[in-house]
Amino acid sequence: MTTAQAQIRNQTMNHDVAQQALDRQEIIETVNKIGLMADLRNWAECRASFSDQVEFDYTSMLGGQPTTVSADTQIQQWKDFFATTFKTTQHLIGSHTLTLNGNTATCISHFQAHHVFRDTSKGKTWTLGGTYDHELSRTTKGWKVTKMKMTALWEEGTSPFSK
């Protein structure tokens, strides 16, 4: 290998490492932004994390099957539900583990979501903990979530979904 070839190889490797670091940071920010923007009720920014069609899987908590819906529809459902059900919420998401594969990625994270009810007849709060499994695709507008799976591992308080 010539010196010039070695320099080109090193530059390419450095670029790849830098791009991978940028991708990892953008993916983590995209995932974190979903919970934070929902908590801030900034639904446009929450929506910006998603592709146009997204598979949502809440079967560990709600039963049934995963559903694929437009992100706009899901955001509107969350907006309506949060407005009528919760005074405030706080989603803490961390311990991100990423797998990058070209223009697709997965991000598995722990979460803890604290919810303060408007109607306190079932209690003041509900806290849920578990994992998120996000699948993302690189787009011209950055990384977008194409699948979001929530696996509930524990909860305290009364779920708003309990009868």
Residues of each region from the PLM?
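A beta-strand edge to alpha-helix "cap/lid" segment located at domain peripheries
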Residues: T2-H15, A83-K163
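Charge-dense, low-complexity intrinsically disordered segments
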Residues: V17, A21, Q65-T68, G123
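Hydrophobic, well-ordered secondary-structure segments
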Residues: Q5, Q20-A21, Q25-I27, E55, ...
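A solvent-exposed, acidic/Ser-Thr-rich amphipathic alpha-helical stretch
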Residues: W43, R47-Q112
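Short, low-complexity N-terminal intrinsically disordered segments enriched in polar/charged residues
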Residues: T2-D52
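Intrinsically disordered, low-complexity regions enriched in Ser/Pro/Gly/Gln/His and often acidic
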Residues: L36-M37, A71, D119, E135
